[in-house]
Amino acid sequence: MDIHRLPALADNYIFLLHDRQRNQAAVVDPAEAKPVLDCLETLGADLVTIYNTHHHGDHVGANRELLAKYPNLEVYGGVEDQGRIPGQTVFLRDGDRLSFADREATVYFVPGHTRGHIAYYFAPGSGETIGDLFCGDTIFAGGCGRLFEGTPAQMVQSIGKLRQLPDQTRLWCAHEYTLGNLKFALTVDPSNKDLQERFQTVQGDRQRGQATIPSWLGTEKRTNPFLRWDNPAIQARVGMTEPARVFGKLRGMKDNF
């Protein structure tokens, strides 16, 4: 399965999955149609599936236009988003399984950013060691999504599920927010050597106009404060230890950063 990262809008990424054997494609969170259609034309592939992580317009904005061109599309989304994702045909629950391009995927229900948010984890293919996590706006490289419809306790539970996945998991989040996220992370975890090194690398990447996505889940576990609510240094920094309170404090600080 080839994964094509397609820039969209101001800072979104759309991900197009290509099954070369069958010459079929699936798209994750199509914010707009043109990048998807251009990529499909280049590949000469047929679009068969949309995977939506949640209902926000910058993740489902192209659903209707793509359905107009490919009326037999299956549109996947969480069952809690029924009526909020245009054209949705498949209503997923936590633990559901699906497959694309001979890769098996598990659905994770991860409320917090929105009440119906889901993530898709594609386990490594045969003979491979790297998995792929499409997490929408739940985890960002160096950060996490705002809590529009959920609570800190929900987000701790949701991210807690995802951080149990292997370190050798590529994290395909939907926005290029990494540099700003790491600037904030350094204010709450300033002695973290891995974080300091990552910031320098990302700063150089962005100065050269390079994308920072995908990230690695192992990197997030070491450097992303929103996966480190149980780290003693971060707990000391915010003056509390209960996971939801630590997370809520971090999120509030980031909202005002």
UniProtKB/Swiss-Prot annotation:
This protein's UniProt keywords: Hydrolase, Metal-binding, Zinc
Swiss-Prot/TrEMBL catalytic activity: an S-(2-hydroxyacyl)glutathione + H2O = a 2-hydroxy carboxylate + glutathione + H(+)
Gene Ontology terms, MF aspect: hydroxyacylglutathione hydrolase activity; metal ion binding
Residues given in the record as Zn(2+) 1 binding sites: H54, H56, H113, D137
Gene3D superfamilies, A to Z: Ribonuclease Z/Hydroxyacylglutathione hydrolase-like
Cofactor note: Binds 2 Zn(2+) ions per subunit.
EC number: 3.1.2.6
Cofactor(s) the record lists: Zn(2+)
Pathway assignment: Secondary metabolite metabolism; methylglyoxal degradation; (R)-lactate from methylglyoxal: step 2/2
The protein's enzyme class: hydrolase
Listed GO biological process terms: methylglyoxal catabolic process to D-lactate via S-lactoyl-glutathione
Similarity section: Belongs to the metallo-beta-lactamase superfamily. Glyoxalase II family.
Functional description taken from the UniProt entry: Thiolesterase that catalyzes the hydrolysis of S-D-lactoyl-glutathione to form glutathione and D-lactic acid.
HAMAP family named among the record's database cross-references: Glyoxalase_2 (MF_01374)
Subunit structure: Monomer.
Protein name, per record: Hydroxyacylglutathione hydrolase
Gene name, Swiss-Prot/TrEMBL: gloB
